[in-house]
Amino acid sequence: MAGRYFEEYVPGMVIRHSLGRTITEMDNVLFSALTMNTQPLHINEDYAQKHSAFGRRIVNGIFTLGLAVGISVPELTEGTLVANLGYDNVRHPHPMYHGDTLYVETEVVEVRASRSRPDQGIVRFRHTGRNQD
């Protein structure tokens, strides 16, 4: 599916993305290695079992964020985005584990003309990721 254009967005619009993605151990370990994140909660099962509140390794939260945004791309911005201006208010209220499947829904929070580029618009999204439960 191709992304939507500025004129197609309306504040309050909610898109439940059709894609879901199961997170594997390899996803988590490779992402942690590529980003040089040596946090043992992500890569050391023995440590996580003995020293974490979760009792096992958790998926790197930044991987989860990136995956959530990626899941949204085909139905939101694929081929239509000029630039991603940033993220704010990122929270990880619950851990993701190896074998969890991430599903995402996006709410359109704001749609407005750009002040610095009058021929372009700005759309603010609220992405919410959830596991299979």
Predicted regions and their residues:
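HotDog/MaoC-like acyl-thioester-processing domains
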Residues: 1-11, 92, 96-133
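Hot-dog-fold acyl-thioester-processing enzymes
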Residues: 1-86
